[in-house]
């Protein structure tokens, strides 16, 4: 999948490890401060508990990250659930792939 340039993509956040891809240097600096570590082509960080996950989601929303849409508990589905229960109160963006090099970005 071809990722958009100058963006931050949340690839996983519902599991035990948060996975983020970015080519934005300022965002990478924030990820380091949040204890993310660089692994090959992406940033990863263990999620301690649900409060930790919610804090990460909040920070990534503030960074205007794109939350990947997909099946099951995709990052976008998790953020939407948090909005439904009132713990995320601001808008966010999602990305869905329609093909290997075709994606759609939506504002929610």
Task: Give a label for each model feature.
Residues 1-108:
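Accessory DNA-engaging acidic/polar modules
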């Amino acid at each position: 999948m071809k990722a958009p340039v100058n963006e931050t993509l949340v690839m996983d956040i519902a599991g035990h490890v948060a996975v983020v891809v970015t080519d934005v240097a300022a965002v990478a600096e924030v990820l380091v401060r949040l204890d993310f570590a660089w692994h090959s082509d992406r940033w990863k960080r263990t999620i301690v508990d649900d409060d930790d996950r919610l804090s990460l989601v909040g920070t990534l929303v503030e960074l205007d990250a794109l939350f990947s849409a997909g099946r099951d508990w995709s990052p976008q589905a998790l953020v939407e659930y948090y909005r439904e229960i009132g713990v995320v109160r601001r808008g966010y963006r999602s990305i869905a792939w329609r093909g290997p090099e075709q994606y759609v970005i939506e504002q929610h």
